[in-house]
C-alpha cells in the first residue's frame, strides 16, 4: 500500500513547475503500478500547448474554468469542475485557463518524473528514473 500527501511532495523532485503550471506527481513509474497520477494546477489567464505523443492522459477538472482546443479537429470544449477529457488519440491540444485550474491527471504509460516538455509540448517515449 502506498499513502502520500501533497504536503510531503511539495518542494521535492515530484513537485514540477513550468512557466504557467505546476504538477505534483503523486504516483510515478517507480511505484510499479502501471500508471502515474498527478495533481496539476495551471495559472489563470494562461495558454498551454501540449502533445503527448507517447502517453495517454485522462484529466479530471476539479477547480477553475477554461477551454480545451483539439488542434486535430479544431473543436473547442468548455472546461469546468466535473469535466473529464481523455487524450486517447495523442491529440495536440491547448488548455486556455480563464481562472486558475486544478486537475487530476492519469498517464499511461506512467511518467518517471524526469520528463520535460519539448518544444511541441510532448514528453519523450521513455526517460530513465534517477
Curated annotation (Swiss-Prot):
The UniProt GO MF terms for this protein read: ectoine synthase activity
Cystine pairs annotated here are none
Known EC number = 4.2.1.108
Q: Which residue positions does the secretion signal occupy?
A: none
Q: Name one Pfam family in it.
A: Ectoine_synth
Q: Which domain of life is it from?
A: Bacteria
GO-annotated biological processes? ectoine biosynthetic process
Catalysed reaction(s) here are: (2S)-4-acetamido-2-aminobutanoate = L-ectoine + H2O
Which keywords does the record carry? Lyase
Q: In which pathway does it act?
A: Amine and polyamine biosynthesis; ectoine biosynthesis; L-ectoine from L-aspartate 4-semialdehyde: step 3/3
- Top-level enzyme category: lyase
Q: Which family does it belong to?
A: Belongs to the ectoine synthase family.
Name the job this protein performs: Catalyzes the circularization of gamma-N-acetyl-alpha,gamma-diaminobutyric acid (ADABA) to ectoine (1,4,5,6-tetrahydro-2-methyl-4-pyrimidine carboxylic acid), which is an excellent osmoprotectant.
The entry's protein name is: L-ectoine synthase
In the UniProt record, what gene is named as encoding this protein?
A: ectC
Amino acid at each position: 500500500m502506498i499513502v502520500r500527501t501533497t504536503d510531503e511532495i511539495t518542494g521535492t523532485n515530484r513537485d514540477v513547475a513550468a512557466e504557467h503550471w505546476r504538477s505534483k506527481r503523486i504516483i510515478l513509474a517507480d511505484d510499479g503500478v502501471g500508471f502515474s497520477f498527478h495533481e496539476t494546477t495551471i495559472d489563470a489567464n494562461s495558454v498551454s500547448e501540449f502533445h503527448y505523443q507517447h502517453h495517454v492522459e485522462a484529466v479530471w477538472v476539479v477547480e477553475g474554468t477554461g477551454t480545451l482546443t483539439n488542434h486535430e479537429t479544431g473543436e473547442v470544449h468548455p472546461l469546468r469542475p466535473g469535466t473529464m477529457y481523455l487524450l486517447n488519440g495523442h491529440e495536440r491540444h491547448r488548455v486556455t485557463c480563464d481562472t486558475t485550474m486544478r486537475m487530476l491527471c492519469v498517464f499511461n504509460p506512467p511518467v518517471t518524473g524526469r520528463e520535460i516538455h519539448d518544444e511541441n509540448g510532448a514528453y519523450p517515449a521513455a526517460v530513465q528514473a534517477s
